[in-house]
């Protein structure tokens, strides 16, 4: 594995204040065994960026540039969410604030279930997918952010299952495994999830 020049700084800021995401990323970076310190932006008192992009890619870049500008360090940001085709792709980029208040997982899950009620009259399977876009910038004005994308396909349950994970994990059903995402361990989830897929592409970019 080669070491990109930004490794020379010895640290990489993770542009997120979401505790669930931070925990997953710390585990993923631990598994990658990269010779660089990962610093969650909260440790540097960096506030959340204003996510006013219209796509996962735009918001990931916005967050990465924001963290890099304040910290003066390379930064990686994740923008992710769940997309449901019968809802036109919603919640999409608004996943974290689907019910109005940012980060209210219970309310977001309840709204998604309610919005899907009209589509369940005949017992139809509701397909959904988790999307993760990672953006890596070496500095705040980096003209060529690196982008890594992962997509995880599944179905949306009629009621929550499982106690692990965060966000919409309790509603995300994996038919091939017969479990919800919230019934997977961190290690199991990281091997197959949208975030795990994107991180694997990041790892491969270093080779």
Swiss-Prot record:
Its EC number is 3.6.1.66. It comes from Acinetobacter baumannii (strain ATCC 17978 / DSM 105126 / CIP 53.77 / LMG 1025 / NCDC KC755 / 5377). InterPro entries: dITP/XTP_pyrophosphatase (IPR020922), ITPase-like_fam (IPR029001), RdgB/HAM1 (IPR002637). Binds 1 Mg(2+) ion per subunit. Mg(2+) binds at residue 79. Pyrophosphatase that catalyzes the hydrolysis of nucleoside triphosphates to their monophosphate derivatives, with a high preference for the non-canonical purine nucleotides XTP (xanthosine triphosphate), dITP (deoxyinosine triphosphate) and ITP. Seems to function as a house-cleaning enzyme that removes non-canonical purine nucleotides from the nucleotide pool, thus preventing their incorporation into DNA/RNA and avoiding chromosomal lesions. It holds the Pfam family Ham1p_like. Keywords: Hydrolase, Magnesium, Metal-binding, Nucleotide metabolism, Nucleotide-binding. GO terms for molecular function: dITP diphosphatase activity; ITP diphosphatase activity; metal ion binding; nucleotide binding; ribonucleoside triphosphate phosphatase activity; XTP diphosphatase activity. Coiled coil: none annotated. This is dITP/XTP pyrophosphatase. Belongs to the HAM1 NTPase family. It catalyses: XTP + H2O = XMP + diphosphate + H(+); dITP + H2O = dIMP + diphosphate + H(+); ITP + H2O = IMP + diphosphate + H(+). HAMAP family: Non_canon_purine_NTPase. It comes from the Bacteria. Its cofactor is Mg(2+).
């Amino acid at each position: 594995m080669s070491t990109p020049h930004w490794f020379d700084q010895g640290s990489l800021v993770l542009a997120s204040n979401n505790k669930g995401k931070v925990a997953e990323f710390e585990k993923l970076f631990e598994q990658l065994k990269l010779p660089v310190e990962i610093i969650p932006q909260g440790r540097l008192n960096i506030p959340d960026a204003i996510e006013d992009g219209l796509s996962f890619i735009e918001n990931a870049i916005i967050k990465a540039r924001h963290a890099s500008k304040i910290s003066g360090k390379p930064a990686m940001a994740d923008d992710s969410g769940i997309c449901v085709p019968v809802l036109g792709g919603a919640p999409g980029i608004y996943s974290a604030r689907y019910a109005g208040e940012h980060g209210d997982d219970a309310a977001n899950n309840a709204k998604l279930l309610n919005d899907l009620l009209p589509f369940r009259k005949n017992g139809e399977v509701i397909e959904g997918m988790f999307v993760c876009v990672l953006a890596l910038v070496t500095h705040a004005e980096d003209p060529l952010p690196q982008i890594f994308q992962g997509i995880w396909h599944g179905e949306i349950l009629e009621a929550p299952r499982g106690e692990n994970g965060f966000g919409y994990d309790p509603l995300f059903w994996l038919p091939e495994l017969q479990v919800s995402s919230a019934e997977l361990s961190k290690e199991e989830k990281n091997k197959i999830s949208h975030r795990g897929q994107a991180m694997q592409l990041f790892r491969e970019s270093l080779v």
